[in-house]
């Protein structure tokens, strides 16, 4: 069954994969910079690779028929990870050597809690289902 949580994860995964891959390509070609539209592509290869890995994993899991319970867990795990990344980016200058600046921190502050909210709502829906 493909529910709302799987759709959210699939779309989020596609966005992360696309953004991360574009970042890596622009960086490899020496075209990454702080001007739009390239600014949406982070020139930090480690950070871009994290987006690619999360995006590819989300897409693969959704396409293999991720159950509602597992989709809930994935949304919560991703939400915790990205909310933590946002907090680290706000607390430390370039945590773990990643260039996390204002734009990246804002993105992580949006997508992390949003994923937590989706995961929590999905978990509540699962608990309310008749056995």
PLM region descriptions:
Residues 1-131:
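Membrane-interface extramembranous regions
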């Amino acid at each position: 069954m493909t529910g709302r949580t799987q759709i959210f994860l699939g779309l989020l995964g596609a966005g992360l994969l696309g953004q991360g891959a574009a970042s890596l390509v622009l960086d490899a070609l020496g075209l990454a910079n702080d001007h739009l539209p390239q600014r949406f592509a982070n020139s930090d290869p480690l950070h871009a690779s994290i987006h690619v890995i999360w995006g590819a994993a989300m897409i693969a899991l959704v396409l293999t028929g991720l159950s509602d319970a597992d989709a809930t867990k994935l949304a919560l795990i991703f939400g915790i990870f990205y909310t933590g990344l946002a907090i680290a980016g706000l607390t430390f200058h370039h945590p773990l050597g990643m260039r996390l600046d204002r734009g990246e921190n804002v993105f992580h502050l949006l997508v992390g809690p949003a994923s937590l909210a989706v995961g929590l709502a999905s978990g509540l829906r699962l608990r309310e289902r008749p056995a």
